[in-house]
Amino acid sequence: FALLSLPLLVGFTFPTVTLDSQTVSAKGYYFPLSEGTDKAIQASEGTSSQFLKPDTSRFYSQAAHENIIRKSADKYLAQSSIVINDENYLEVMEAIYDFPNEFEGKEIEFIGFVYNDPNHTNSQFVFRFGIMHCIADSGVFGLLTTGNTNQYENNTWVRVKGKISNHYHKELNQVLPTLEVQSFIKVDKPENPYVYKEF
């Protein structure tokens, strides 16, 4: 009886914890794979640690993936303004990172939590934790923001709206799509803070 009741006791006694900025600080954010990731182990296990840019390429052939991402990008590029929600979050982010020049100047809006990068004064990332296929393929995805006048603390949930521009990120040694903020409003944490990729 004690053995069977232990999981129930633990489940009701310990609080539920969600991933947040503390997790980002502990794991770091890198592009496209986390630093120190053993790619040979990933290949043998079929898993990957993803940060900033969702990457679904390993789930399709190269031609199929290129076709899917191109269609996805075209669908959102045809919109005058893109509202990113829980259902399309990973799809839109992957399209933005795959075609940053085409999305430059595009207005987008989405909800995420704030992460203050100690290396970027007056710049904040807005992230969501996402799951691509299973928990082994999870990561933190979002955009660097600039121009916001309100500097929120880590883990503050915000609705951010602005236009995509491309800026060089010194630590990652590459150009990243960046959101030039038009509005940055504090919101309540969503009931489900995670986003998922539907295949």
Locations of the language-model features?
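OB-fold and OB-like single-stranded nucleic-acid-recognition modules
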Residues: 1-199
